[in-house]
Amino acid sequence: MFIDLALIYYVSVNPADWDDCIGQLLTELTGVGRLVCFIDTYRKTPCTFYFLIYSITNILYLIINLTSRIVSVGYGIDLTRTSIIWCKTRQYFLIILSLISFTCSWLSSVDQYFVTSRHANLRRMSNIKWTHRIVFLLILVSCLHGIPCLIIFNISSITNQCINSNIIYAIYSPIYSLTFTCFGPSLIMILFGYLTIRNIHLTRVLVQQHIDRQLIKMTLFQVILIAVFVTPYSINVVYILITNGMIKDTNRLIIENSIFTILTLLTYVYYSGSCYIFLISSSRFRRTVKEKIFNWRKPNQINPIQQPTI
């Protein structure tokens, strides 16, 4: 029992040794695969455009979050403790990128519900022009929503850590997290994932072609991804809020901290696992990735122009 608690304690007090290295590895592995999201053919439908924005924000989130933590652990350079600018901007970008990522996830599931609907009015709501406007509005609102982070986050003179110095925001933060980046997206994606499957069973012949059926599979796999790797973290946040005022012994605190660390690690899989989900669920995605990689490796060739002889 003592050995188990000692191991758990090590994990809880050294989370970066586990989650940062694994997360950075996943980032590097998925970087090549996600390049396919920038191909023109994957930007012409609402769902794939949501996937594009989702992939970009996930990459940026992992780069900003994990790189700074790895530098802090590996080289002892923690800019959040020494630079007030980085303390504020890091929190700012993390909050807006996570909001955009989760919102694009559930918007893609809503779009697939519209696409598979038997009602023409609902199918018309899947419109690329409206999608561009929604994404623009989402980015604008997310940037405005993150502004308080630039004001209230400061380096504590006591602990020398980058912390929130506003009591009201400390109350708002877990509520926001549960609503917009935890339970909210999970419930919406599960609901519309079920409705999409229901539409498919009710409709013998889909209006869309095979590529759209593959998009449906990709979206449903997204539902599984967020349900498996984000929902447990959401439940743990609720548990922490409920038991916040309770008196806990050292062993319980060690176990709770280790569980929180492990579940936080699982959320990194959400940010880095989308490429693998797309590769598993879509043969077209796999084929396009393969073609794109091999095309990059082929040198450009110029065919000589033969002049007609007189």
Language-model segments: residues:
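Seventh transmembrane helix
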Residues: 223-238, 258-307
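Generic structural signal for small/hydrophobic residues in well-ordered secondary structure
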Residues: 58, 89, 111, 136-140, ...
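Intracellular signaling interfaces of 7-transmembrane GPCRs
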Residues: 35-49, 110-134, 190-219, 241-253, ...
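Hydrophobic residues within alpha-helical transmembrane segments
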Residues: 53-56, 93, 137-140, 180, ...
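Peri-membrane helix termini and adjoining interfacial loops of integral membrane proteins
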Residues: 10-21, 67-82, 112, 153-164, ...
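Extracellular TM2-ECL1-early TM3 structural module of rhodopsin-like
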Residues: 24, 28-30, 47-107, 171, ...
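Extracellular N-terminal segment of 7TM GPCRs
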Residues: 1-33
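Fourth transmembrane helix
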Residues: 2-4, 60-71, 97-108, 114, ...
